[in-house]
């Protein structure tokens, strides 16, 4: 465009048209002027071809009185038609770049200076940035088109000019004297390459300073994945198995890599930060963060893997937002392939999401590529985030860990442990989860729908509701090397084989998953909705008068302050009255007024929904609730007997609720809780004997409500054991027992009006049966039928009668005894 007078004329007209809209400024003109030798020829090097960039540089040079890039320049006998060149070739319309040789202008300049010792040329790398620094831009639409590390095409450049042109900045780097490079006497080709390398460093350093570091790894990683020995072997195996050429199998591996890899860009992170800042403060009443300082302390020098609990689709974005706001690098996030949809998938990918298929079975090549991708992230120190629960919890409980990602992480660490790995549990608590109504349908028995990010958009119509606050607590970090030292001493010296899959991998991974789940529960953020749900769902009519509810909430707060669950658990501010006011403001409580005051209750829809929020903190109250349960049927008990019964039930409660204490710690914790119950007047103590208050007293009502927090869990335990005992030895398989438990629970929920669909959740029964097997109480025979130890009868009758009412035990036994008989209508 600038190589002839006519082209310069056209270029000038284009520049004038451009500046009808564009406004630009030079950032460091004075420093450039001080270092520029006006007696020497000047050439401007631009990073990549762009007519608009050139027009802006020409405008700024004219304004500053600097040599214009579009005018001819003489270097000794060499006459160049213009004083600029592009360091890299022009991308096509799709943004793809063809690697070619050095710029012809640079080739000619090096040759001319090499032949004429008295000549020199100053090359000024110059960069044009469209829009403000991403760190200071506040418009989400402008951020989408701000400069980034990605290669851009013409269409994106045009949109950048239109949207960002009025905030354009030009930055000149210090001049590079070509004579200094030529005098190294490296020869023509090496000198040209050296000049290119110096300029690339200039451009990279400047871009890093202006828009942040290049943390987009897709272009670097995907091509490198197929060169790993393990992936190459998988490609060869694929070619042989499918009878296809190696090149076709390699292309398949590259396709998998592109499907998986994130396309992390700083600009997208800033865009999401702007949007989410509005979201958290418009939809929610902000985000409260606790214990992030410990993460800031361990992040340097460690590979950090964030393992949050999973309650909502917005969990994906929340953690990245918080880390970015607190000066920590946002992680690369494992996301289901179902979220890789048009527009949304691209934005998530640029925000750090990498996508994984639901199952790797039957596809060893995909498995190898995915494993290598994660290994590369780990060894290069990129922070990573994944959910050990797999999917979102629909019940509010901590789900049983899915160990797939943990196993991949563990194998990667065994392969290379140079970078220490630290797991950081992150508890995310919502006072009202966005997908609550969707979960409500599933809790009521609707089939679980396929996960989709569009679940969020389905609740837009409900955004007029108050959603309260979001709480994010960072839990106690788990250092993987230290964990392995405890579980498998000497693991560093063991022969692990080419696949890094030792015999102890599965068992150790399971324990790691359980440890992560316990640390997540330790970091629970207890909020007003949790406590109100816990209190009202423990009543027979889902209702209390305001003063009674206030007393219950004050009791719970006092107990938790006296015996904190863990140092990472947080409590709500205020007293019981303040908690009620807060929950009423969220329309989660109904009220009825009369002359005696207000009655607060849960309507039918909210009663089911509130089980979700109760379950968030059920583990916190499991042990005090269990202790209180012993006094519903016994007026007094000795400390020794209490300890014996708690120890009998604790393995099953711990397995279901991921309680934090080891069996060795249990006695000390029991004593702490007994002391707290005594101090609050719920028990009396005489030497080694504990006694309940009078049944007609207010304290006994409070003790009863506390006991009912754990009653449904104990009922499920008793159902399973009663069915086994009534069926006899070696008559039921684990699957048959599970199905019978579900049917029995459904019937009992009708008979006793239990408005909690999770009561008959088959996964809870399945896990209880598995725990009985692990504890040696059950043992499958060769046909898979379950035999049981004498301890089962002791557990069912000796312990259960201490914690469940006679009416409940009788009802369960009757249903178990007559399970094969036609059932009568419960109304008759």
UniProtKB/Swiss-Prot annotation:
InterPro entries assigned: GPAT/DHAPAT, GPAT/DHAPAT_C, GPAT/DHAPAT_LPLAT, GPAT_PlsB, Plipid/glycerol_acylTrfase
GO biological process: CDP-diacylglycerol biosynthetic process; fatty acid metabolic process
Source domain of life: Bacteria
First-tier enzyme category under EC: transferase
Topology relative to the membrane: Peripheral membrane protein
Protein name: Glycerol-3-phosphate acyltransferase
Reactions it catalyzes: sn-glycerol 3-phosphate + an acyl-CoA = a 1-acyl-sn-glycero-3-phosphate + CoA
GO CC terms in record: plasma membrane
Cell location: Cell inner membrane
Molecular function as annotated in GO: glycerol-3-phosphate O-acyltransferase activity
This protein's encoding gene: plsB
Species for this entry: Pseudomonas entomophila (strain L48)
Comment, domains: The HXXXXD motif is essential for acyltransferase activity and may constitute the binding site for the phosphate moiety of the glycerol-3-phosphate.
Motif (HXXXXD motif): 309-314
Keyword line: Acyltransferase, Cell inner membrane, Cell membrane, Lipid biosynthesis, Lipid metabolism, Membrane, Phospholipid biosynthesis, Phospholipid metabolism, Transferase
EC identifiers of the protein: 2.3.1.15
